[in-house]
Design a protein with these regions (language model features):
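FAD/FMN-dependent oxidoreductases across multiple families
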Residues: 123, 230-304, 311-326, 330-331
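Conserved Rossmann-like nucleotide-cofactor binding loop
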Residues: 12, 35, 156
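Short beta-strand to alpha-helix junction loop
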Residues: 88-109, 227-234
């Protein structure tokens, strides 16, 4: 029986664990946290239909109180002079789910299908023979061997970060690759009537990042996010500002009240080695514009499990696993790379530049509602007259779209077979399309 070791109970790893255990693989998930502590104490948006497909549970069978509809949305410019409102109908309303019941559903699904779990066990490093991964070593000195290690241990995964250089997997984290966030749900002291209860701030208080204030039925959800680390003084400063603008925000934290680090860059071009496959945050599987990555991670778990099932009689070499790497980039990664170009172009502008784009309708509701999905070169050229009121800012966004589109085209056409030299040259072309954050 082929042995599968999943490092970390991330979304992608749990999906793969369930699929593989059901198909006769010997699957062990090693997770450093207690089972009951897994999952952020906040909500996220993703495709509920995909979760139903994975778990076999309809939305009516999801845990009671685990999800809700989110209200209408408004994006505010850095100066707060311009507000772009987005109104939803019965068919377009956004659904959000608490992360803890989501993780519980995925764990229960994997357990039901035969996967085994080892909680409260910290992984220290991979066990390697040359460039091949053979298992993991835990912090207490135990060694676990497997035919493949699925790395679902997050952006700072001790498996990935300690891989030998011969794997050629990129471990560098650059400024702008991560989003540092603090999020809490506060009690409400009043019940205001709001057209757009979910307010999103780009360059909030003129700092590179994104924040929001979402007034829910019983709580006020506040996110403070930046591309650079911040501490308690910044949180207090920002909460004072939010309470001034939203005086119904109370002092009591009902949920959350903690930091999170979210990858916001294009996926790794190379995420496999002999006996190793990265998935989820360890491979930067998120949408750069908004940090949403649950859908990408769930799909990655399905793709990886399919490749392993199809090749169950083979050694899980980089050449075999490249099929997973390639399929994910084609099916999921191409748009993420385009999205990064737009995100980095926006974050490289001074706040006055973002104000200009808002106030001259270069950025509109249709662009923001899809996290940049609806903004392309053709639509941007339709805003040429307004944009040319300040060519420097306008062409910075045009350049971001052009470079992002070029990267997306390359992501959609990775080398057909695993050949490191070809992969290196292809990856370097993609790196040449990257927009660097100033």
């Amino acid at each position: 029986m082929r042995k599968i070791l999943v490092a970390g109970a991330g979304h992608s790893g749990l999906v793969a664990a369930a699929e593989l255990a059901q198909n006769g693989f010997d699957v062990l998930v090693i997770e450093k946290e207690k089972k009951e502590n897994l999952g952020h104490d906040w909500e996220d948006r993703f495709d509920f239909g995909l979760l139903s497909r994975i778990t076999g549970k309809s939305i009516e069978e999801f845990p009671e109180g685990s999800w809700r509809f989110r209200g209408n949305c408004a994006f505010l410019s850095p100066s707060k002079r311009k507000k772009i409102e987005i109104f939803y109908n019965e068919n377009t309303r956004q659904k959000v789910m608490w992360r803890k019941p989501l993780i519980r559903m995925l764990i229960e699904n994997a357990e039901r299908r035969g996967a085994k779990f080892l909680f409260e066990t910290e992984i220290a490093a991979p066990l390697c023979e040359g460039a091949a991964v053979k298992g993991v070593k835990t912090a207490d000195g135990n060694e676990f061997y497997a035919d493949i290690v699925i790395d679902s241990a997050g952006v700072f995964s001790p498996v990935k970060m300690n891989l030998p250089g011969e794997t050629h997997i990129d471990k560098e984290i650059r400024r702008g690759d991560l989003f540092y966030g603090w999020r809490a749900y506060f009690n409400k002291t009043d019940r205001p009537e709001l057209k757009t209860p979910f307010e999103v701030y780009l360059y909030h208080e003129r700092e590179q990042g994104l924040s929001w204030c979402c007034t829910n039925e019983n709580t006020v959800d506040i996110l403070i996010g930046r591309i650079d680390k911040f501490g308690e003084d910044k949180i207090k400063e920002q909460l004072d500002i939010f309470r001034h603008d939203h005086p119904w925000t109370g002092e009591e934290i009902i949920n959350g009240g903690n930091y999170g680090v979210i990858p916001v860059r294009r996926p790794l071009t190379l995420m496999v080695a002999d006996g190793y496959a990265a998935a989820g945050d360890s491979a930067f599987m998120t949408m750069p514009m908004n940090g949403m990555g649950i859908d990408l991670s769930l799909n990655a778990g399905l793709i990886l499990a399919d490749v392993l099932k199809t090749n169950s009689e083979k050694e899980f070499t980089a050449a075999v696993l490249w099929e997973y790497n390639r399929r994910f980039l084609i099916e999921q990664g191409a748009f993420a790379s385009k999205n990064e170009g737009l995100k980095n172009a926006l974050l490289s502008l001074p706040y006055e530049g973002v104000d200009f784009l808002f106030e001259n309708n270069v950025i509109q509701a249709s662009d923001l509602s899809g996290a940049g999905k609806n903004m392309n070169f053709k639509t941007l050229m339709g805003k040429f007259v307004n944009g040319m009121k300040n060519p420097k800012y306008f062409f910075a966004i045009v350049n971001g779209l052009i470079k992002g589109s070029g990267a997306a085209s390359l992501y959609a056409n990775p080398p057909e077979k695993f050949n490191y030299e070809k992969i290196r040259k292809w990856s370097e072309k993609i790196e040449g399309k990257a927009v660097k954050i100033i």
